[in-house]
Amino acid sequence: SSLKTAFKDMFWDEKKGYLADFCDDQSKDWSFRPNQIFATALKYSVCDKEMSKSILESSKNKLLTSRGLKTLSEDDEKFIGSYIGDQKTRDHSYHQGIVWPWLLGHFAQGYVNIFRDNALPLLEEIYNEFNSEIADYGVGSIGEIYDAEPPFAAKGTIAQAWSISELIRIK
């Protein structure tokens, strides 16, 4: 369709194999972020199967951790892996690498859309990674965000509804 063609022309780079994070008339931001997984998770996606597969595999390799998806790839000079410091410093790091568990639901939906039954082993692994966190840290819940580097310490709100709800959706 013309919408899919326009979207692909605007956001896709065949060589990079992923979507631009932001586009305007003058430039494109090629920071590798999880925002593109939403396009793969839609029932009527603007991405074709090969685009979605490339986005998901790249996201798995560059963003997926045992606690969620990083908000920015480590190979980006803007990457900040720890949520520490004063309020201004922490606020700045929030979208620069910090891990958000709630993004896992959309990642999982995209993975199922493309890989169908072959997605199940990865999704079970993702879910099972949280067993001790659910039992010990949040007593039935999980944190809002996590550091992007081992040991992936929980930060922010100790029991975040959108984080646990997306994990339940995976289950």
What is the predicted function of each stretch?
Residues 1-4, 98-134:
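Extended amphipathic alpha-helical segments enriched in small hydrophobics
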Residues 1-82, 125, 132-164:
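Catalytic cores of carbohydrate-active enzymes
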Residues 10, 100-104, 162, 171:
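Bulky hydrophobic/aromatic packing residues
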Residues 27, 90-99, 112-118, 154-159:
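Short, contiguous acidic/charged loop-to-helix segments that flank catalytic cores in large enzymes
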Residues 38-49, 105-117, 166-171:
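Well-ordered alpha-helical scaffold segments within catalytic/enzyme domains
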Residues 81-90:
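The feature captures the short pre-catalytic strand/loop hairpin that immediately precedes
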